[in-house]
Amino acid sequence: METVLSFSAIAVAIIVGLCAVGTAIGFAVLGGKFLEGAARQPEMAPMLQVKMFIIAGLLDAVPMIGIVIALLFTFANPFVGQLAG
């Protein structure tokens, strides 16, 4: 049982780490492309900003699902119940 808990802790750490790295890379690319587009066409900056915020919200949604799965493995691990019963 300790093996399942230790592997679950490692899996949670990997999930949280990859969520953080993936979100950081996504925001870096998104911000860079926004600044590039705004520098090329300054009159389009307000429209690009609205689209950037919409995409930023969608970009945050995927890691939040990963964090929910990590919390599930942390506090309500389904694999421990299989070992006990």
From Swiss-Prot:
Keywords: ATP synthesis, Cell inner membrane, Cell membrane, CF(0), Hydrogen ion transport, Ion transport, Lipid-binding, Membrane, Transmembrane, Transmembrane helix, Transport. SUPFAM superfamilies: F1F0 ATP synthase subunit C. GO terms for biological process: proton motive force-driven ATP synthesis. InterPro entries: ATP_synth_csu_bac/chlpt, ATP_synth_F0_csu, ATP_synth_F0_csu_DDCD_BS, ATP_synth_F0_csu_sf, ATPase_proteolipid_c-like_dom, F/V-ATP_Csub_sf. It comes from the Bacteria. Pfam families: ATP-synt_C (PF00137). Belongs to the ATPase C chain family. F(1)F(0) ATP synthase produces ATP from ADP in the presence of a proton or sodium gradient. F-type ATPases consist of two structural domains, F(1) containing the extramembraneous catalytic core and F(0) containing the membrane proton channel, linked together by a central stalk and a peripheral stalk. During catalysis, ATP synthesis in the catalytic domain of F(1) is coupled via a rotary mechanism of the central stalk subunits to proton translocation. Key component of the F(0) channel; it plays a direct role in translocation across the membrane. A homomeric c-ring of between 10-14 subunits forms the central stalk rotor element with the F(1) delta and epsilon subunits. F-type ATPases have 2 components, F(1) - the catalytic core - and F(0) - the membrane proton channel. F(1) has five subunits: alpha(3), beta(3), gamma(1), delta(1), epsilon(1). F(0) has three main subunits: a(1), b(2) and c(10-14). The alpha and beta chains form an alternating ring which encloses part of the gamma chain. F(1) is attached to F(0) by a central stalk formed by the gamma and epsilon chains, while a peripheral stalk is formed by the delta and b chains. HAMAP family: ATP_synth_c_bact (MF_01396). This is ATP synthase subunit c. The lineage of its organism: Bacteria, Pseudomonadati, Pseudomonadota, Gammaproteobacteria, Vibrionales.
